[in-house]
């Protein structure tokens, strides 16, 4: 009989997306059945919230050892996932602008639902990018360091501290890119990773611009009431 404690393994990274998407679609369908206003925003917000909860719950299990062994898991195309998520974010943002600029004043509940889509969408994109960074980092496995004779990852990010990076390290890196569109204390060391960081930085810049525009638009709208 096996002894010792067994560690519950996390879902595959794309399973998180699939489960969250199903929950979001169910919420959207329920909103349509109940004829709730802003059904698109409700579905988007539930998808975002479900994904974030699942990612946060799985972070402690995304150890360096697990990521190294499972980096090759690609049960859904990454580009397709990002494309679907960006479409959902766009729908949520468009719903917000339509709500702000319509002739009839929005009530507090409608504004809250619409406004939540922006921070939740922002966090979802960067959480998704964090998992992509993590798996891309460990995709090529380990290499032997010629000086120390130790096995080191060849993933393209140089985290300070000398320890194997875990899920929270990649979430930190992704959030820094999302907030500042630049790196902080982590160096990018390969061309492949630089391309990913470049796309992420450009996306973050435009998303942050949309957030500022939405805030200004909302302030003007509320000031005219």
Question: Which residues are covered by each model-predicted region?
Answer:
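Loop-to-helix transition at the N-terminal end of transmembrane alpha-helices
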Residues: 37-53
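Helix-coil boundary and interhelical linker segments in multi-pass alpha-helical membrane proteins
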Residues: 28-39, 98-113, 221-225
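The first (N-terminal) embedded transmembrane alpha-helix
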Residues: 9-32
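Alpha-helical transmembrane segments and their membrane-interface junctions
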Residues: 88-111, 175-191
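Pore domain of cation channels
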Residues: 169-176, 184-224
């Amino acid at each position: 009989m096996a002894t010792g404690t067994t560690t519950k393994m996390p879902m595959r990274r794309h399973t998180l997306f699939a489960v969250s998407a199903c929950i979001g679609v169910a919420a959207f369908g329920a909103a349509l059945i109940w004829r709730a206003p802003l059904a698109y925003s409700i579905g988007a917000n539930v998808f975002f919230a479900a994904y974030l909860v699942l990612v946060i719950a799985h972070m402690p299990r995304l150890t360096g050892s697990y990521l190294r062994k499972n980096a090759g898991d690609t049960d859904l195309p990454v580009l397709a996932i990002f494309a679907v998520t960006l479409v959902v974010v766009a729908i949520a943002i468009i719903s917000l602008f339509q709500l702000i600029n319509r002739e009839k004043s929005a009530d507090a509940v409608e504004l809250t639902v619409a406004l939540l889509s922006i921070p939740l969408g922002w966090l979802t994109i960067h959480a998704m990018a964090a998992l992509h960074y993590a798996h891309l980092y460990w995709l090529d496995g380990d290499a032997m360091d010629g000086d120390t004779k130790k096995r080191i990852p060849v993933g393209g990010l140089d985290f300070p501290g000398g320890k194997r990076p875990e899920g929270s390290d990649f979430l930190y890196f992704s959030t820094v890119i999302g907030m500042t569109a630049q790196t902080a204390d982590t160096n990018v060391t390969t061309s492949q990773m630089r391309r990913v960081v470049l796309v992420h930085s450009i996306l973050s810049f435009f998303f942050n611009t949309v957030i500022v525009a939405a805030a200004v638009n909302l302030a003007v709208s509320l000031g005219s009431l």
